[in-house]
């Protein structure tokens, strides 16, 4: 039972392109305050796409990405950054 409890407590479901909040939290964990609001909005989508693909447990396929997903990830990352400035 102990093993199952540890597994349940550490299980993280896979992340996909529409999991904007999960992706934003992972990006903030990776970059922290290195990227402020202005820098986040200036990130090239090609770089953002690459960084999302590098997130552990990310199971989205590159071809499933689109500009709408990347815009939502970018704006959600800004909100995550703002929340951590308090």
Model regions and ranges:
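A charge-rich, low-complexity, intrinsically flexible signal that marks solvent-exposed coils, linkers
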Residues: 7-86
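N-terminal amphipathic/basic-hydrophobic helices that include classical n-h-c signal peptides
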Residues: 1-7
């Amino acid at each position: 039972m102990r093993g199952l409890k540890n597994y349940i407590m550490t299980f993280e479901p896979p992340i996909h392109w529409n999991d904007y909040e999960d992706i934003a939290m992972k990006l903030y964990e990776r970059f922290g305050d290195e990227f402020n609001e202005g820098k986040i909005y200036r990130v090239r989508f090609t770089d953002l796409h690459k960084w999302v693909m590098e997130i552990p447990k990310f199971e989205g396929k590159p071809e499933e990405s689109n500009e709408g997903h990347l815009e939502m990830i970018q704006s959600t990352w800004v909100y995550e950054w703002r929340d951590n400035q308090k």
